[in-house]
Amino acid sequence: MKRVSVKNYLVCLLIAVCAIFVFPANASAMHIMEGYLAPGWCISWGVMCMPFLVIGFFSIKKKIEVSSKNLTLLAMCGAFAFVLSALKMPSVTGSCSHPTGVGLGAVLFGPTAMSVIGAIILLFQAILLAHGGITTLGANVFSMAIVGPLVSFGVFKLSKRWGAKAGLAVFLAVFFGDLMTYVITSVELAMAYPDATGSFMVSLGKFISIFGFTQVPLAVCEGLLTVVIYNVLAKYSAKELKALSAIY
């Protein structure tokens, strides 16, 4: 059987990215959209993101200095996340449901590195695809590029410690990271738009319940897809993954 290199998968992902630009999704399908949050919330979420982005920058720099091949893997993780997070399914007003794609990168490179990649992805989507917005970038980064990868990384490490097989550990990491992204998105929306009675919890329950109908199936599908890609990388880039402590 002909050996398939990691570069071929990267090329396929880049082609998919180009296809998104050629056949863009409807602009009504997006992350928390431009102008949907009050300025105070936009500033607050943005400030909360800054420490993670700074730490993530140095984390990426260190990993690339260790091996230049990590740059190819990181680019692939970024392309994978870009493609998946651009696949929109309409959900509650002002937002949407979609895979996040950041779980793979979190497992391979850690959560802080993926926070930088996720922020870049969200910025490009806001500017070029009208997905999300500039003012709401901080809120979207916090939920998808910070909390999601943190949860995925934590679940992967715990699963590894408890003796779970690599495939199961990756699936659980991606699944829970995906769901937690939307829990945080629901928190952001509930804080900005509490129930008419003034209850945060009532509003949060409404947002989470609506997101759940679309996000749970998407999280399962993303988990299965990520396991397939992880297995391919583990087969053809085992040395690099071992160096990243992402294989066992």
From Swiss-Prot:
Q: Which residues form the signal peptide?
A: 1-29
Q: Which GO terms describe its biological process?
A: cobalamin biosynthetic process
Which compartments does it reside in?
Answer: Cell membrane
Pathway(s) this gene product operates in, as recorded in its UniProt entry? Cofactor biosynthesis; adenosylcobalamin biosynthesis
Which keywords, in A-to-Z order, does the entry hold? Cell membrane, Cobalamin biosynthesis, Cobalt, Cobalt transport, Ion transport, Membrane, Signal, Transmembrane, Transmembrane helix, Transport
Q: Which residues cross the membrane?
A: 40-60, 72-92, 104-124, 136-156, 167-187, 210-230
GO MF, one term, reads: cobalt ion transmembrane transporter activity
Report membrane topology. Multi-pass membrane protein
Domain of life where this protein originates? Bacteria
Record carries keyword Kinase: no
| Free-text function comment from the UniProt entry | Part of the energy-coupling factor (ECF) transporter complex CbiMNOQ involved in cobalt import.
NCBIfam families assigned: cbiM, PRK08319.1
Subunit details: Forms an energy-coupling factor (ECF) transporter complex composed of an ATP-binding protein (A component, CbiO), a transmembrane protein (T component, CbiQ) and 2 possible substrate-capture proteins (S components, CbiM and CbiN) of unknown stoichimetry.
| Record-given protein name | Cobalt transport protein CbiM
